[in-house]
Amino acid sequence: MAKLSKDRLIFGLFLIVLIAIGEIVLTKLKLAAWPAFMIMIFFFEAHMDTKKAANILLGGLFGIANLILIKMFLDAAAPSLGLDLAKLVYILVFVYLIVALGEVVPILFNNYCFMFFLVAGLAAMTPAPNVFQWMAVEIVGGGLFIAGILCIMKILGAMAAKKAVKT
């Protein structure tokens, strides 16, 4: 069984402060918090690899933006195909493009794109959805969360270096 790590406990304290600040600011501004927090979760899932940050941010942004594209497609295709079939066609093409172009344009066509499209689609069913707001929160808030996490890591690194000098 693993032991409690002092570094993880300290990281956790800094992280909950970051989360609280993010939640308070977004709530005060009456902005949806979920896009920024999804970025945070995916950044952790990517083991805080800064090389994946652009794929997470831009893939997520593209996923949310697809709500605009599907609306345009449905407006054009639903009269002839019916709403359900038009929606299915769009989703099938969207998933196919993620698979087909995932290695060609991985910054946009990736799993983050698909997950943000799915969650944004569900969020769009709530009262007063605001896709453009979600996109802004995803990029700005998510980017700030990534920066905050990296800042926490630097602080912990500096603390460890200071401790190493003392011993």
Task: Please name every model-derived segment.
Residues 51-62, 104-114, 129-140, 159-163:
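A cytosolic-side transmembrane-helix exit/cap motif
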Residues 26-28, 78-86, 102-104, 132-137:
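Interfacial loop-to-helix junctions that mark the boundaries of transmembrane helices
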Residues 10-22, 54, 58-70, 86-98, ...:
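Hydrophobic faces of alpha-helical transmembrane segments in multi-pass integral membrane proteins
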Residues 3, 8, 12, 78-89, ...:
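Interhelical loops and loop-helix junctions of multi-pass membrane transporters/channels
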Residues 68-79, 123-135:
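Hydrophobic alpha-helical transmembrane segments in multi-pass integral membrane proteins
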Residues 1-51, 127-135, 143-167:
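Alpha-helical transmembrane segments and their membrane-interface boundaries
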